[in-house]
Structure formats: structure tokens, C-alpha cells
A protein has these predicted regions:
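N-terminal small/glycine-rich loop or linker at the start of catalytic domains
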Residues: 1-15, 74-89, 113-118, 223, ...
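Active-site groove signature of glycoside hydrolases
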Residues: 106-127
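Short, acidic/polar
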Residues: 16-28, 94-109, 158-162
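Beta/alpha (TIM)-barrel catalytic core signal, keyed to glycine-rich beta->alpha loops juxtaposed to Asp/Glu
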Residues: 126-307
């Protein structure tokens, strides 16, 4: 599978109403986009109910109202971090929780199967074999085509893959973690405590595991590459950042592109699938145009070597 821009649907049904979400989905697919990424807990922290499901519901309504759309798109969703009640603890990854969450996600999405099902977070309170077995059942039952681990450390992913092999069930073939062109300082905690960053160890693990792919989220750093009103977090306050931004600006000028587009093109050139959360048509257009950029070997070398 060649890496492509993935539409992040976190804001659908909350910050972006249903009609506007439909427009963004139409635009994305009209421009050739295929993958749509959501989760069963999007977005409980925004919705007055204190529970998620709004994003999946909007996508399901869109599929219902667009005959043939399901055959043109690929859908990924996640479970593990939806609150069990407003303000309550997350559902976790017990076999019971996974089965219940998957069934509800399929109902909301108005589909019989998702193309990739993610364990959204770790749950070390549950035996790994139990979670792995329940996830594997989703594939054997036809509810999911493939499985991924979101916000898991590399060693736990590998242990889970070994457990799946031991049980004779499908294991993880994708990792989803936070990654972008600018790299934060590892000694400064990010405000989003549940996020797990890609580190050199992660990339080394992926390079030695060819059947495991990386999906990157927060690729555009909440707009910080291009918006002065959204400064970079403290974790990005180090000497390497100005050097990388200078290289980014040079290549952007050479290509007549935006910083965001060069970041996405750089990720794609490294076979990393960037998830781009969108709320406006302009953001969809910018992201899909980035997919058409072909950076030269020299440009990629300069970008990677900077900082």
C-alpha cells in the first residue's frame, strides 16, 4: 500500500456540523482521497453529552446518502478511550469492551466492516492475550479487515504481534503515533498526555518490520507551521527547530507550495501516511495538492539533514 493523505474526521459532528462535514467528505473523495480516520470517542470532550460517537455517526449518514460511496472509501476507527459514562473512565480493551465498541461503531458507520480497526490506547489492566484475541476475532468474523495499534510503544506492539501469532489470529499491521517534520525535545512532556511520539527507535523498528506501516497524526502541529496565533509548544523550543523551518521555507519557495504541503510531501516521501484533521474546504484542497508534490532527492536530503 502506497502512503496517501488520510482524512482526519475528529471534528465531524461537533466543531463541524453534518452538512459541512458532508461537503468536506465529498471534496476529499472527488479529489481522489480514500482513507477516512475516525474513532468511537470523537469527540466526547467537545460534545455536551460527554460521550463520543458524533464523528462515526456523521460518516455513516454520509455513506447512507451517497450511493456507492462505501466502495470508494476505506474507513478506520478505534476503540479503547471512549468514556463508559460522562466524566467516567475509558472503556479499555477487555474482550467485552472491544466487542461492544466494535458493534456500536459498525452501527454508527452504517457498514458491515471497517478496513482498519485500531486499539486507540494501551490498557495494561487487561491481559495482553485477551485484548489480542478479541481484536483478532474482529478480523475472523469479518468486522475488520486489518488491525492497528494507536499510541502503543514499539515493544508492546511487538509483544502483541507475537501473542497474535501464538494464538493463530491476525495481529497489528499498522502503528498510529504523533509525528511531524519538526521534532520536539524528548525531555519536555506534551500537554496531550495520551499522545505517544515517534522516536528514532520507532522508525528503526518499522524499518526492520516491513509488514508494519506508520500512520502519523498531528502532522501539521495544530496549524503552528502557518499560523502566528498558534505558536509551537514549549517542547519545540530548541536550536534544531529554526534550522528545520529555514529548510522548510527554502523548499516551499522552490516548489511554490506552503509549509504544510512540504511537511506532508516529506512524510509521504518516507512512506508515512499523514492524517490531516480538516474543518474547511481550503484545508482539504491544500492537503490533497500536497499529495501531488514530488520532492527531489536533493530536497529530501536537505530537509532531513536540517536540524
Amino acid at each position: 500500500m502506497t502512503a496517501s493523505v488520510i482524512l482526519g474526521a475528529l471534528s465531524f459532528g461537533t466543531r463541524v456540523d453534518e452538512a459541512a462535514s458532508f461537503d468536506l467528505l465529498d471534496q476529499f473523495t472527488d479529489l481522489g482521497g480514500r482513507w477516512i480516520d475516525t474513532a468511537n470517542n470523537y469527540s466526547f470532550w467537545i460534545d455536551p453529552s460527554g460521550l463520543g460517537g458524533q464523528s462515526e455517526t456523521v460518516i455513516g449518514h454520509w455513506l447512507d446518502q451517497r450511493p456507492g460511496a462505501r466502495d470508494r472509501v476505506l474507513i478506520s476507527t478505534k476503540s479503547g478511550y471512549e468514556p463508559v459514562s460522562p466524566g467516567g473512565p475509558p472503556e479499555g480493551l477487555s474482550a467485552k469492551a472491544i466487542r461492544a465498541a466494535a458493534e456500536l461503531s459498525l452501527q454508527r458507520l452504517s457498514t458491515g466492516r471497517v478496513d482498519l480497526y485500531w486499539a486507540h490506547v494501551e490498557d495494561r489492566s487487561v491481559p495482553l492475550d485477551e485484548s489480542v484475541g478479541a481484536l483478532g476475532e474482529l478480523v475472523s468474523s469479518g468486522a475488520a479487515a486489518a488491525l492497528g495499534a494507536s499510541n502503543w510503544p514499539a515493544w508492546r506492539v511487538e509483544r502483541a504481534r507475537a501473542a497474535a501469532a501464538g494464538q493463530g489470529v491476525t495481529g497489528f499491521t499498522a502503528i498510529q503515533q504523533r509525528y511531524s517534520y519538526l521534532q520536539p525535545r524528548p525531555d519536555v512532556a506534551l500537554p496531550e498526555s495520551g499522545h505517544r511520539l515517534v522516536f528514532p527507535e520507532t522508525l528503526d523498528y518499522l524499518a526492520s518490520t516491513p509488514d508494519l506501516r506508520l500512520w502519523a497524526y498531528n502532522t501539521l502541529l495544530n496549524g503552528s507551521y502557518v499560523r502566528s496565533d498558534r505558536p509551537l509548544a514549549e517542547a519545540y523550543n530548541h536550536p534544531g527547530v529554526p534550522r528545520r523551518l529555514a529548510a522548510l521555507d527554502t523548499v516551499a519557495a522552490e516548489e511554490g507550495a506552503s509549509r504544510n504541503q512540504i511537511v506532508l510531501a516529506w512524510l509521504l516521501a518516507h512512506d508515512i501516511a499523514p492524517i490531516v484533521g480538516v474543518t474547511t474546504p481550503e484545508q482539504v484542497g491544500e492537503a490533497m495538492a500536497a499529495q501531488r508534490l514530488q520532492l527531489t532527492a536533493d530536497q529530501l536530503t536537505r530537509l532531513t539533514a536540517a536540524g
